[in-house]
Amino acid sequence: MTFSRQMAEWACFPDAIRQNRPITNPAELFRCRSVTELLLACDADRREIGDNGSDYGYFSAFCEALPCLAGNATAESVLHLLRFAFPESPEVSFENRTVFWTYATGKLMEHPCRGGDVLPPGTRYCLCRAEETPATLPKTLLPVLSAESLLPEGRMLPEKWEKETERVLSAFSAAGCEKILFPLSAEYRFVRPDPYHVALTLQKERRTPEEQSLLITQLFRRMCIACKAHNWLLIPDFRCGSQEAVGLLSCFLRTGELPSLCWSTGDVSTRSQLLQFSLHTPEVSLRPVLLRSDAPEETAFSAMQAQVAAQYPAGRTCVSTGYGFPFF
């Protein structure tokens, strides 16, 4: 078994980068939900880093949290981005926060730039919901469609759902999309898709868990077809049971609709059935991904690696830190 640590394949980039807006201060380069969650975990003042807090307060909170975030992949990504954007700046630290801020804002006043201009070279992937406009992304960012955002809320005609799905897929294709993320929650139960029952379910304002699972299965089938047509990679995030995951994959393997897949294992102790399915399905390219966030402690992560290596003795398993921010 060969494990390879790899960068996260999509990211929760801040709006200034996602929308390629003019940058006025360094905090705009990393102020986003995933970083905010980290700062809250380090006991940052919620008022200081909330929506009503100042950008300088946010930057200061990040600097103060650095000792707590030592070795954290997200924090390292932010520091790398700041070093790339301001190569001659002082070191980022709580002691230097005011000096760094003054230097960086001064540079941005002298040389105005947009969010996309400060990204280091190389293509990266940005997770986007269906309602977003991927065309606003900088050219160095390729959109990854978060498929669950295509699930209809309330009543909808099947024709309208298909038309809206096709519109979104076309927009993402035009923006250079190569991958679709498809989360499957612990509540998902495999229900074989049936056009008649799908149409009936779409007419309902409220749906039972089984009816919601039916629509999820139908949407998964639609994403399989799209990925095959565009030669995209489908990335199911299986938080459901192994039996449900294998039932879903087997259904579309039999119909010939299953594309190349890359999936996250989650808790490997409950994944033997899914791992064996991967091992014995050579006609489909299945690549498990271990999420570093599933076992943050090094000892637990090593044990998870060993367990997957024992259950999945062939092929290549990737390891992703998976914290939601880009890793350069």
Model-assigned labels for residue ranges:
Residues 227, 234, 238-240:
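Extended alpha-helical solenoid scaffold regions that build the rod-like backbones
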